[in-house]
Amino acid sequence: MADYLISGGTGYVPEDGLTAQQLFAIGDGLTYNDFLILPGFIDFISDEVDLTSALTRKITLKTPLISSPMDTVTESSMAIAMALMGGIGIIHHNCTPEFQANEVRKVKKFEQGFITDPVVMSPRHTVGDVFEAKVRHGFSGIPVTETGKMGSKLVGIVTSRDIDFLSEKDYDRPLEESMTKREDLVVAPAGVTLKEANDILQRSKKGKLPIVNDSDELVAIIARTDLKKNRDYPLASKDSRKQLLCGAAIGTREDDKYRLDLLMQAGVDVIVLDSSQGNSVFQISMINYIKQKYPELQVVGGNVVTAAQAKNLIDAGVDALRVGMGCGSICITQEVMACGRPQGTSVYKVAEYARRFGVPVIADGGIQTVGHVVKALALGASTVMMGSLLAATTEAPGEYFFSDGVRLKKYRGMGSLDAMEKNNSSQKRYFSEGDKVKVAQGVSGSVQDKGSIHKFVPYLIAGIQHGCQDIGAKSLSILRSMMYSGELKFEKRTMSAQVEGGVHGLHSYSFLPFTRNGYIEPGSRGHPRAGPNVPSPAVTKHSS
């Protein structure tokens, strides 16, 4: 047998594939479909893959997924769901500043550790006030103090059990006649740790645990519902106060400074400067303003697609960069403006430059499949921002409608005339607020129902983990290290190779990306259990 056919222990492995540097040195603009990653060696199970990654210089996520600041993608419901699953949502700004700030406030109030600014009432408030608060805030466990303010002496608490069976004729009854009195409450002393307080709350079997000082004055409160959320969502993205992380987008004009102030009052964690072309004097000026007024606030700059664009924003002090121009499914910037760059090349070029300064990169746009997420991360992105992939989920804004028997939701680009007509924030993003003739850089369309984020995101997480497993990377930091060291190998795909890599040779087929009748229980990381028959994105196709 010829020597080159003899196997076993030779130590010889021929060179195969291209490094990322070689792949992008060719000069062609590459999209995610234009290349593949060659497989590596597997010595771990997919559940062991650590998806922790940096959103900004100071904020880390356990899941590298972000929902886009689009008015058909992210408001409070989406942001809450994304944060619970370990990612983060960025509230869009195609609305009034007050509406946007209130959406951020809803996210921050959804889950908390020590609640230091709860709704508080006095004994003179009425049962009707509690019902009104329940409608406004979604809960009715309200502490009662002498003055109706924090820092005042605790005299009781009113819960749904106290008022559930009261009728409208009782709405004028003062709370001192309906509340659970102070002597019947379980409380914890000021200075108690969150773990100790949670233990007391569990033993008490109560819904709320007031925290009081030596003078019996209310200083904080914790809620049983938050305990359950901690159990069900161990990956949840939280700040130092145990509130869910939330981001918001703003523009780069003078009136956006007022919007910024309202968002800061609402507790926003990260600001995304929303511009189709981020390398501008407007954005640099806004970065300088924010860093002077709110030096600890994390700021994401963009969008950029070249190292030269990135340099100016990094020099101005951004904490992360958003990469992508004209690559979204509803974006036509490349066609209309002749400006942009294929997303694969954009991510690699900007990430390779920004990493030298410790600035994480967000791959924004062009994500059609979970494989595209893996490719973006393998090219150096720390996180991935998604629009169309999350559109038409239960948590996305808008109402479902039917067309030809298919359940759909509206999805539109922020550069569409549709979005521009709703609010001038969208116009500012494309520098067109003063134009007599508006030039659309996006389109409006519809997307098929994907079901809930709580079922769809676990599918994305599992897909990313399996992709990293096939590559041989046990974490995203290892994945990036393999790419920059040249250990990770790529290969360009011809059009024929792309056809071969997809479904082919069938008359018709059904595509169901994740389990329909089972779902991933939050925190189980890969163990399906029986669940309700919630619609999943299924596609039946026929070959022509």
Curated annotation (Swiss-Prot):
Enzyme class: oxidoreductase
Entry keyword annotation includes Nucleus: yes
Binding site for NAD(+): D274, S275, S276, G324, M325, G326
Reaction(s) the record says it catalyses: IMP + NAD(+) + H2O = XMP + NADH + H(+)
GO biological process: 'de novo' GMP biosynthetic process; developmental pigmentation; eye development; GTP biosynthetic process
EC number assigned by the record: 1.1.1.205
Protein species of origin: Danio rerio
The protein's name in its UniProt record: Inosine-5'-monophosphate dehydrogenase 1a
